[in-house]
Amino acid sequence: MANLLKTVVTGCSCPFLSNLGSCKVLPGKKNFLRTFHTHRILWCSAPVKPGIPYKQLTVGVPKEIFQNEKRVALSPAGVQALVKQGFNVVVESGAGEASKFSDDHYRAAGAQIQGAKEVLASDLVVKVRAPMLNPTLGVHEADLLKTSGTLISFIYPAQNPDLLNKLSKRKTTVLAMDQVPRVTIAQGYDALSSMANIAGYKAVVLAANHFGRFFTGQITAAGKVPPAKILIVGGGVAGLASAGAAKSMGAIVRGFDTRAAALEQFKSLGAEPLEVDLKESGEGQGGYAKEMSKEFIEAEMKLFAQQCKEVDILISTALIPGKKAPILFNKEMIESMKEGSVVVDLAAEAGGNFETTKPGELYVHKGITHIGYTDLPSRMATQASTLYSNNITKLLKAISPDKDNFYFEVKDDFDFGTMGHVIRGTVVMKDGQVIFPAPTPKNIPQGAPVKQKTVAELEAEKAATITPFRKTMTSASVYTAGLTGILGLGIAAPNLAFSQMVTTFGLAGIVGYHTVWGVTPALHSPLMSVTNAISGLTAVGGLVLMGGHLYPSTTSQGLAALATFISSVNIAGGFLVTQRMLDMFKRPTDPPEYNYLYLLPAGTFVGGYLASLYSGYNIEQIMYLGSGLCCVGALAGLSTQGTARLGNALGMIGVAGGLAATLGGLKPCPELLAQMSGAMALGGTIGLTIAKRIQISDLPQLVAAFHSLVGLAAVLTCIAEYIIEYPHFATDAAANLTKIVAYLGTYIGGVTFSGSLVAYGKLQGILKSAPLLLPGRHLLNAGLLAGSVGGIIPFMMDPSFTTGITCLGSVSALSAVMGVTLTAAIGGADMPVVITVLNSYSGWALCAEGFLLNNNLLTIVGALIGSSGAILSYIMCVAMNRSLANVILGGYGTTSTAGGKPMEISGTHTEINLDNAIDMIREANSIIITPGYGLCAAKAQYPIADLVKMLSEQGKKVRFGIHPVAGRMPGQLNVLLAEAGVPYDIVLEMDEINHDFPDTDLVLVIGANDTVNSAAQEDPNSIIAGMPVLEVWKSKQVIVMKRSLGVGYAAVDNPIFYKPNTAMLLGDAKKTCDALQAKVRESYQK
């Protein structure tokens, strides 16, 4: 049995397991009884995972012994990551001292400190430099490696065959960090790029140190200082890093490369790309340029000779894999430069690009300072070690993704750009057998990959296909149809009163359109709340139809009283909630307010009317005009924070004046007045109670509930008006118009009522937020619509009361069912559009009442609210790049979606802990926070507000970026942040802040996904293609705070999770925000 087990173990493909067969049993001091259960191993049907548990493996980090080498293979953060994964880590004493990492730092991260021999004998050894002779121990490091162990290091196998022979004798498996394929999936573990990035930056710093003038140009009292001119040859990682650093220091930067893509990158950094007249592509393999033709090189030399006479600093990075670096600048060119110039040769280790370079030295040749250091990354040891450590930890996690066992498989058959390609390219020796170089992968892209057109480019091409004639013809057709419709209304008008009402409706709609567009997005929530309150003027319709004495005496009067009661809930509750929200936007530095003084115009308006009425004047129509203008002022007042409270006051004055004018025109008896007052008082009391108790985070469902009341009031009013007017239809010339408007108002009110209730249920959590996609729902909705439209035929044709009231009852039921089926098919994340559409419906229902009762006030206010909701719906749809029909019918996909296969997202994500996040926050000077609905759901606005306050006190620039559809109703996040005390002037909209992301040090994404998804711009086939998003990935660093890597509402994977500048801080949003707040406070109190 022992032999059988030994055979199984030694035959395993993972080199660590082969050691288990030859392990020694150490004698112990006590005797133990051990039962050897073989049957569970031999006959168990459960599959056995390949590899070896992480907890049984030790990772060793030796001290680098190469001369002047200051780097270390793993930073304390890297150690912590491996320990968290399950590895045991041992670090040689003093290994990180030159990189400013003490032994105590490593101990705190979970590592053990041991000697060189013990560390090198680990299962897996990670190094920076390749193994070499240890002069202190008098033995080669390769001879100290564990037999059949694994080594990860820079190896350069083509240049070090002797080293490979030594490693082969130890049966080592070797992963060469210099052989990581330069493919997209491997960007996170490309150590050559990491080191080149540091070398490029350090080259500019050294050049500036040895250059005798400023880099940036200056005009001083002592004279003008011209900017330094820098030429950078080679647009790889090092060259681009140099260009970015030099440009940020104010120099004039020029860049040269044989590859067109590299020249574009130079241009994007603000450098001037240089080209020769001869056109020849320099695209090579593995991220390097190819060798060029003789003619091209001659033209290149001519360009360089000219540039040497002009520039002050030369930085060259040109390399050819496996060969000596090409000489690009001869001695004559260098000597033609101005005295005091500096040249930095980043290719010095491979011989150098300058004929005058002395590798590893700094010297001056005829007044030109030459920097030929070959250890530039080591001269920034802390940063270099941190990046190299990140490369290694990401590589280990990528090649062995299993959570329990360490295992990877080396295959000779693999596709280009896959993990199989990465593993096979990186592993240069397996179990002592040299397998370098790797075989050619399959499916290699031919030449440079075709650049996929962005969504913006596709949209521009689509727009270009529309000819000016077609564009003008479309516009002319729209105006023709509109004017034809107006002519039709004039011909069909039964009387002059209808034409006047249409005129009022049209002008009010235009005024509302232009007024609402001026409202700042931050005040969209108060706007919806105040329109909710104003829509309570459906009470006017109820008052006009009320009758009886202390109690209603007929069915129609009872319906009217109920409509008045319901509308009063809206009025009182809506204005109080609006006032609460606006009070939250107050800042401590704002001047005092005396809003009670607006009682003066309110008293003058209402009191003056009552005095005029007592004097015998009938000025109800003028009162309606004044009330309508006040309602316009209410919407206009919300255009800015400074006038928002005035707007709410004007809304109250307008509604109060309208109700007073209605009562004055009716002149009810005392008993009926008592009934009216009682209905309004009871409704108002209930509305105030609800508004006082509601939490601001529950505002969307409150708005939805209030919308349902408006819809129900419209239905009740229309049915009551039909019942009251029915006896007069035979002699009334406008009877048909009255019937049509009553039928239309009933339909709109029914959809608004039931749709709002479903929206309320979804937002409150009573109903599931997910869309309810009934089979054949479109046919069902079409049938309900056909039934509703068809019902008007018998309603208009049959003059009997029974038929009429039956048709109104039927359309009420059908529209209510349709409101349910439509809204239930819409997911919770689309509720902003649903609420704004319902808001618009409530306005059109109010207009229908205005036409029905021939009331100018209801028509004016209804047009305002209807246009307000329509504009907000349009804004929401534009923010999602979706059509209104797509949202309302429960559809998916934007108007720009191409319909092909979405791009595949590959790569690994980076996870950090709270301490890492605090370090990033502490180091950042400019921070943007982009919250999503997750912030609302977790109610994490308070710790975030306190965090922002602390960071601002430390001199950091902290702002918020809000997407229009980030919450569950327009402007919800603005109100929540205001509630927590965040000043509104640091809360910016998407269009205001998107251009600032490239200059931002850190972005905190809290509970957002689709609104920051780069697939909207990068993938034309994505269902969110073309959707405007917050471009957070353009910042220097992003921290995404989410529960998991799961998709958002649109069910689209987010590429930013896998971008190299993104770190994932996973966990509950509220707990994470609380912890961040506490950690930041603790760090600043030290």
Curated annotation (Swiss-Prot):
Which sequence positions carry the modification called N6-acetyllysine? K70, K397
Q: Which InterPro entries match?
A: Ala_DH/PNT_CS2, AlaDH/PNT_CS1, AlaDH/PNT_N, AlaDH/PNT_NAD(H)-bd, DHS-like_NAD/FAD-binding_dom, NAD(P)-bd_dom_sf, NADP_transhyd_a, NADP_transhyd_a_C
State its role. Answer: The transhydrogenation between NADH and NADP is coupled to respiration and ATP hydrolysis and functions as a proton pump across the membrane. May play a role in reactive oxygen species (ROS) detoxification in the adrenal gland.
Looking up Gene3D superfamilies in the UniProt record yields: NAD(P)-binding Rossmann-like Domain, TPP-binding domain
Which reactions appear under catalytic activity for this entry? NAD(+) + NADPH + H(+)(in) = NADH + NADP(+) + H(+)(out)
Please give, as recorded in its UniProt entry, the membrane topology of this protein. Multi-pass membrane protein
- Disulfide connectivity for this sequence is none
Binding of NADP(+): at which residues?
933, 965-970, 1009-1011, 1026-1027, 1042-1049, 1068-1069
Q: Which residues carry this modification: N6-succinyllysine?
A: K117, K224, K294, K331, K1079
Q: Where is the transit peptide?
A: 1-43
Q: Name one Pfam family in it.
A: AlaDh_PNT_N
Q: What is its EC number?
A: 7.1.1.1
Q: What is this protein called?
A: NAD(P) transhydrogenase, mitochondrial
* Top-level taxon of origin: Eukaryota
Looking at the UniProt entry, the stretches that span the membrane are 475-493, 501-521, 527-546, 558-578, 596-616, 622-642, 646-666, 672-691, 702-722, 740-760, 778-797, 801-819, 833-853, 857-879
